[in-house]
UniProtKB/Swiss-Prot annotation:
SUPFAM superfamilies: Subunit VIII of photosystem I reaction centre, PsaI
Listed name of the protein: Photosystem I reaction center subunit VIII
GO terms of biological process kind: photosynthesis
Residues of the propeptide: 1-11
InterPro entries according to UniProt: PSI_PsaI, PSI_PsaI_sf
Membrane-crossing segments per the record: 20-40
Annotated gene: psaI
Function: May help in the organization of the PsaL subunit.
Membrane-topology descriptor: Single-pass membrane protein
Family from the record: Belongs to the PsaI family.
Keyword Plastid attached: no
This protein's UniProt keywords: Membrane, Photosynthesis, Photosystem I, Thylakoid, Transmembrane, Transmembrane helix
Species for this entry: Nostoc sp. (strain PCC 7120 / SAG 25.82 / UTEX 2576)
Subunit structure and binding partners: The cyanobacterial PSI reaction center is composed of one copy each of PsaA,B,C,D,E,F,I,J,K,L,M and X, and forms dimeric and tetrameric complexes.
Length: 46
């Protein structure tokens, strides 16, 4: 039963790459760089 369920999940999830590629390529770097920029610009880092 579980082996027949897995291919249907993978077939229905073919649209996920068009969501994850922009998220990994744009959102994650923007969030990381903005956090690091705000962190290094603080007065009381330590």
């Amino acid at each position: 039963m579980a082996t027949a369920f897995l291919p249907s999940i993978l077939a229905d999830a073919s649209f996920l790459s068009s969501i994850f590629v922009p998220v990994i390529g744009w959102v994650v770097p923007i969030a990381t760089f903005s956090f690091l920029f705000l962190y290094i610009e603080r007065e009381d880092v330590a």
